[in-house]
Amino acid sequence: GVPGKQEGIFIDYLKKNGKANMSQAVPENTPGAKKAILHYRVLDQKEMNGKSRALLKIKLETGRHHQIRVQLSHAGIPLLGDRKYNPSGEKGTSLGLCSCGLAFKHPKTGKIMKFETEPQGTAFLDFVKKL
């Protein structure tokens, strides 16, 4: 799907179910719920197989279990190929999730270590050609 705005922030409360290996968005006062904050920006969007698709850049403020998958599904824009959080989604499509960048401070030198790549996987083929 495509978000309603070109960029935004989702703030939800997530609760993990370890037995089912799933998390869900719940009301703030739910016991065991943890705050989850996700920023997004639409990099590209197009029609594919009769459906609107968007390529998003995500920045997490928090690192919750399946956070991106849960928050996007809860917002009505589940990831392409995510059968766990969008059971009615397309079958046979790879999960449209790729960590394209990682940065952290080296524990000994203090130097910022930064790693980047293009999105990988068949879910990104139509988008990567344009990047």
Predicted regions and their residues:
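RNA pseudouridine synthases
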Residues: 1-131
